[in-house]
């Protein structure tokens, strides 16, 4: 077995790492996933973006420590899912967790073809107006919609504008259609399943959902890193024997990987090779929340995460000091939107253009002790 990682070491590791890409499995809430990561790392300040329903699985992004301030920049990114829609039954929650409130007669279902499903998808493609599911976290007069729905009160929810793109995966069999959906933030895939069933006149609900990506962050990154680590560990230890590995490697790799830890990543109609995923990927057993169940994740620094969203721009020590104090800086760059200002990885900031060449800090992550130390070194070196 690998040496045990002390909680204080784990705290330092995650406080520095800051951004996690987590593979949430079905059966737990996003809040529970955060709580388990919080318990593992000892970092109290952890937040997430893009809540997944308990029955859903896939990519969940978390920010640790000061990186929680970066979540706002990830929340509005487009998302990509694979989903299974079951036609012929409508439920109270628009997914398989709810009670069935309508079942279509068999003759009606027999008329459904992949072509008619395609026409329904066309109606639900592009920029559309969508009414969210009644069982949602949207607030209505201060109350969550799902709380009202559970009391038998059907909340009146306003339609919202969303963008949706469909891709069909395989044939229509057993009243189920498998799809890949790319959509804007705020889209309810459950509502898409409901509306497809409504358009076809047979009812429908979401029976499976997995999130593959949020903007430039992808689920397969978790397993790509794990596969790399597995290969490295195999090279270092004959016959996969992990005896004698150092605590340092325990901090890096967290846990030994065994054949029993194989995680089947194959999905119906999905070409795993195209997604960069092996047919069978090895999942690190990093967070145990019930017997035999775990969460798998990989880590990014705040800079790695933010530079995927905004163009990184190197700034001087003086400019970094100004930004950390909330002052505007001048930059000779042309951009209509925000950029990521970086100073020797001691400061990371999202800055917005004010006027030609003038930029204001919007969100700043900095270590003033390092900044001041570097500034002093620069000053002494110039005298």
Swiss-Prot record:
Its EC number is 5.4.99.25. Keywords: Isomerase, tRNA processing. It catalyses: uridine(55) in tRNA = pseudouridine(55) in tRNA. GO terms for molecular function: RNA binding; tRNA pseudouridine(55) synthase activity. The active site is at 53 (nucleophile). GO terms for biological process: mRNA pseudouridine synthesis; tRNA pseudouridine synthesis. It holds the Pfam family TruB_N. Belongs to the pseudouridine synthase TruB family. Type 1 subfamily. Responsible for synthesis of pseudouridine from uracil-55 in the psi GC loop of transfer RNAs. HAMAP family: TruB_bact. This is tRNA pseudouridine synthase B. It comes from Tropheryma whipplei (strain TW08/27). The gene is truB.
